């Protein structure tokens, strides 16, 4: 089989909208590849632009999908800086590996290092290395809110904590939590492809006994269990919908981290969580919002 690769260069604030447009035509998922800049002092930073990429099979529907995507990008271009759609064919044997060249090892926070599994890395003594093979459908922590969630986990996860990761994707946050000292992590995702990818990454990092990956959402975690840290890096609408159940899973004086939120609905998320007794700190990364929430033990 041959595949069409669709790609567009966009500014950071347009990533979510463009990714949504791509996902409507590419059922296999979307790759978001922010620019990675390597510093002279072993630092890795993310640039202001990203490439959104997806693959669809070359079949009778491919021209229709291309036309629909071009039209969607034309409309989005009236709001944000969005590049033209580039299209190229790749062979089956190339498709499995073509996206790998767009990834690099990079550092997040003070200790976390995210390493694609096919790249070598020599860790420093204090590094917490998370090794990922995300597959073409899943990111590796370069999205602004994923990075912020990783940075917050580095601050709030304590040795021996139990952590719930809702919407785990590649498993990056669950793996980071374990690497930072969590004794047990439960990770869930409604997408079976994500569940498979996360389980493979958990196995690759040899933490099968500490991390359990389940198909589903917050209710898929064992009934009655609560956690020191609950993290959900998804989208605002789903966070609002799940808010009561997410908060119910946080232990008294525990921590809730929610991300994947664009600026416009952020106040609605804050209002819903505040109504449930969560005291919030807001972190802004461009047009993306992440909340760190604390329970005071009264819930």
Please tell me what each predicted stretch does.
Residues 7-123:
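N-terminal auxiliary segments of SAM/dcSAM-dependent transferases
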Residues 22, 153, 246:
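Class I S-adenosylmethionine-dependent transferase superfamily signal
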Residues 136-222, 226:
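Conserved SAM/SAH cofactor-binding pocket of Class I
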Residues 193-197, 238, 265:
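Conserved short alpha-helix immediately C-terminal to the canonical SAM/SAH-binding motif I
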Residues 230-231:
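Hydrophobic beta-strand segment of the Class I
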Residues 243-255:
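A short glycine-rich, Lys/Arg-flanked "PGG" loop and its adjoining helix->strand segment in the class I
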